[in-house]
């Protein structure tokens, strides 16, 4: 009974969420697009000509937003064909519906086959920006969840170290709580500038936050 009440409350909040309504109106697949939008507007992350990699991209709202920023011309409809000034590669182990001008690679980005496909798309270019909205399936056990969250951040950090330009940036999702300070410390070891970000589009009750690292300390 309590679970049903929880589901009803969640559904009510979701339906009445202004970001959900905005996403539906503007053609985004998820409200998460507005988290990236707010951070991008604050930090000027996405610029014409960039190479951007979106880790854990499904369902694709972050790639949609990045695509819109790189779209040529004044009109930036979410699914408008017409090319972009830059390259976007989206990766996920789950399938994703196609997005115009976005290269999607399905598979684990730690595997050689997927990395080979990525290298073919990049054509020898380093990456300007890595974005990751990845989140584990949470169990409710704090220690286990902290380890899973930290693991995903570690994967993103390793990927960034191997593919970013020296002045590139990495934006990842994490959660306040056990293990958060360790994640921040790892970012500080790898990047010259590290800053937390809590966009308004993040739900008030959520411990979700984002960490932005810029300028590698030890480029490849």
UniProtKB/Swiss-Prot annotation:
Keywords for the protein's UniProt record, in alphabetical order: Cytoplasm, Methyltransferase, rRNA processing, S-adenosyl-L-methionine, Transferase
Enzyme nomenclature, EC number: 2.1.1.166
GO CC term (a single one): cytoplasm
Record Pfam families: FtsJ
Subcellular location as annotated: Cytoplasm
Span list, region Disordered: 195-220
Gene3D superfamilies to which the protein is assigned, alphabetical: Vaccinia Virus protein VP39 (3.40.50.150)
Residues forming the catalytic site: 173
Broad enzyme group: transferase
Catalytic activity: uridine(2552) in 23S rRNA + S-adenosyl-L-methionine = 2'-O-methyluridine(2552) in 23S rRNA + S-adenosyl-L-homocysteine + H(+)
Stretches assigned to coiled coil: none
Binding site for S-adenosyl-L-methionine: 60, 62, 92, 108, 133
Gene Ontology MF terms: rRNA (uridine-2'-O-)-methyltransferase activity
Function: Specifically methylates the uridine in position 2552 of 23S rRNA at the 2'-O position of the ribose in the fully assembled 50S ribosomal subunit.
Family, as annotated: Belongs to the class I-like SAM-binding methyltransferase superfamily. RNA methyltransferase RlmE family.
PANTHER family the record matches: RIBOSOMAL RNA METHYLTRANSFERASE, RRNA METHYLTRANSFERASE 2, MITOCHONDRIAL
Protein name in the entry: Ribosomal RNA large subunit methyltransferase E
Native source organism of the sequence: Burkholderia lata (strain ATCC 17760 / DSM 23089 / LMG 22485 / NCIMB 9086 / R18194 / 383)
